UniProtKB/Swiss-Prot annotation:
Monomer. Binds ATRX and EIF5B. This is Annexin A5. The modification Phosphoserine is found at residue 37. A pair of annexin repeats may form one binding site for calcium and phospholipid. There is a cross-link at residue 29 (Glycyl lysine isopeptide (Lys-Gly) (interchain with G-Cter in SUMO1)). It comes from Macaca fascicularis. The gene is ANXA5.
Amino acid sequence: MAQVLRGTVTDFPGFDERADAETLRKAMKGLGTDEESILTLLTSRSNAQRQEISAAFKTLFGRDLLDDLKSELTGKFEKLIVALMKPSRLYDAYELKHALKGAGTDEKVLTEIIASRTPEELRAIKEVYEEEYGSSLEDDVVGDTSGYYQRMLVVLLQANRDPDAGIDEAQVEQDAQALFQAGELKWGTDEEKFITIFGTRSVSHLRKVFDKYMTISGFQIEETIDRETSGNLEQLLLAVVKSIRSIPAYLAETLYYAMKGAGTDDHTLIRVMVSRSEIDLLNIRKEFRKNFATSLYSMIKGDTSGDYKKALLLLCGGED
């Protein structure tokens, strides 16, 4: 049964981009900045509406809204507001570009985005990436990664996952057996087998394969991945399995570990909260509450501070 996706941010009723542009200008003009007005306004408008405000701001004041926001705000709060202002169709592509740019590769970002986006979303990301950066996402990924990790990313980026159709029980059995043979029953691991099955079979088929695998082997597929692989490949295969089981649950877990323990991974916190605010953040909140002994709202509240915290809590949209 398909889950109905629900975001926390929707179009603001009675939206007036000129009035909003004036409110923002007033909040930034003269001495000091009225951060409260900025964050309240921007978190309650959809991304499409924020783009309209930006255009109205340019028309009314001859100024670039994003530049003004950047010069008035600082730190994590600035990063969050800048992320909210990015056109949503560009946001994932932008994050991937930055993960690949310069010295070192941010595998965490590559893994999270590429594993948790649907084939349709991945196709759109590839298109936007090429338009924006003049190079192919796939080529850039190949140039910056290696081994089976690279291979799995490329297979996912092909976005050729089978569409969900009727379940073929014989094929389910065959794939589950093949995974068992490729891992637990083999000296060493046949990574290619995992990559092909995880990267090309339909979501509903794979859910059945994971159940069947448990029956055949006595292990959850995650335990096998943990034992049979390591490093970036292990992280990616686990992210794919978790996303196949439930994207909101995978992203809830991603948020949880971004905040758990000492220090906060603010980059991840901002990326997930912003990129999912209009897609499935309500679903993520529900999974968070179900799987961890607290709510997303309380965890953000305890883990962040100041205007940054206020803005994140407004995006979160409530306690569960």
